[in-house]
């Protein structure tokens, strides 16, 4: 996956605005802020250390599980789908491909995402993205969604 994220611009949306777009709620709302910049979505999530997914993963050395990295990317990408969804429609994960975990994420880290929709053939959407901490890529991959309902 070779794409570069553009510099931030556009309007920042915080959690309450994100809740108007995504159906996720705590503890599964995993974006603190997001920007739509052209064809890209840029998101952030601050790992506080008290999240449910850190309990037992791993005692004394907590790390954010890889599946949570993927969920954060998915939520960021789904912000891009929001304009085209009708009432009651829900994008669901259809697949993950070429996912690579490159750097661990720990409590106190701020995850920054960059995602874009590569291709769309309704009801399927194909995206790619990456998440970084302090400029280091933690995860990258391609993922797809199927829009259901409505």
Q: Language model features by range: what are they?
A:
Residues 38-39, 105-109, 116-150:
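HotDog/MaoC-like acyl-thioester-processing domains
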Residues 13-25, 86:
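Short aromatic-glycine motifs in intrinsically disordered, low-complexity regions
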Residues 3-12:
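Short, Lys/Arg-enriched N-terminal segments with co-localized hydrophobic residues
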Residues 32-33, 98, 128, 142:
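Extracellular/lumenal ectodomain signal focusing on beta-strand-rich modules
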Residues 26-64:
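Catalytic strand-loop segment that frames the active site of acyl-thioester-processing enzymes
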Residues 34, 64-87:
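Active-site helix/loop of acyl-thioester processing domains in fatty-acid/polyketide metabolism
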Residues 28-30, 111, 125:
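Hydrophobic core residues within well-ordered beta-strands of beta-rich domains
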Residues 76-112, 142-146:
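Hydrophobic beta-strand-centered segment that forms part of the acyl-chain substrate-binding groove
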């Amino acid at each position: 996956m070779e794409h570069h994220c553009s510099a931030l611009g556009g309007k920042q949306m915080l959690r309450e605005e994100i809740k108007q777009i995504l159906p996720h709620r705590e503890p599964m709302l995993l974006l603190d802020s997001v920007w739509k910049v052209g064809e890209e979505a840029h998101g952030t999530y601050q790992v506080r250390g008290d999240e449910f997914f850190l309990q037992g993963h791993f005692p004394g050395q907590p790390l954010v599980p890889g599946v949570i990295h993927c969920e954060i990317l998915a939520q960021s990408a789904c912000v891009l789908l929001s304009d085209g969804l009708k009432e009651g429609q829900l994008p669901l994960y259809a697949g993950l491909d070429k996912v690579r975990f490159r750097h661990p994420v720990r409590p106190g880290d701020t995850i920054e995402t960059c995602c874009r929709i590569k291709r769309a053939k309704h009801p399927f959407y194909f995206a790619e993205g990456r998440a970084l901490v302090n400029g280091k890529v933690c995860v990258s991959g391609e993922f797809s969604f199927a829009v259901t309902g409505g």
